[in-house]
């Protein structure tokens, strides 16, 4: 399921254009305070890190981890943004199933990223994860920039895009080494949607979420 990989520069430019378009002008909600956004990221990483430190990445309780991620990330908003114009075309049944499957698909992606960049030897979060800086992006969002140190090799740059939620800021995109999760998934899903529409994407996702991460 997916398109041929885009070049990194293309993905970065596409991400900037897409995310900029998602921020309307005028009197929308203000961007969250940078310190609050950093605390949300730090708390989420710490919780997930401690869960993973207790066992193998593959054996982590899926629903427990999803519940933790749900506290810090707006997966429903991310899912709608990924679907783009097709969200308006989907009927209520398709929307409900899509969001349910999308949560689990993101879990699979999350575990794959962890395996790739973190490995099995987690160590202490304070030794492997560092928030570098944060800055406002557009009128409504804050970008928290961080660095993750893998067991071997160079540190990995991980940026978190947050927007004000109901009670506190929520994560709406994850950008690893300049590659936006939102933009990447929108490109991959778009290819499937062009071929088979909403039902075609749902069929693909049903298969994907039953496969080992």
Q: For each predicted feature, which ranges?
A:
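Early exported N-terminus immediately downstream of N-terminal targeting peptides
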Residues: 34-114
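Compositionally biased, proline/threonine/alanine/serine-rich low-complexity intrinsically disordered stretches
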Residues: 29-36, 50, 203, 207-213
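N-terminal secretory signal peptides and thylakoid transit peptides that target proteins
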Residues: 1-19
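Surface-exposed, charged secondary-structure patches
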Residues: 100-102, 108-156, 211-213
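Low-complexity, intrinsically disordered terminal/linker segments enriched in charged
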Residues: 173-213
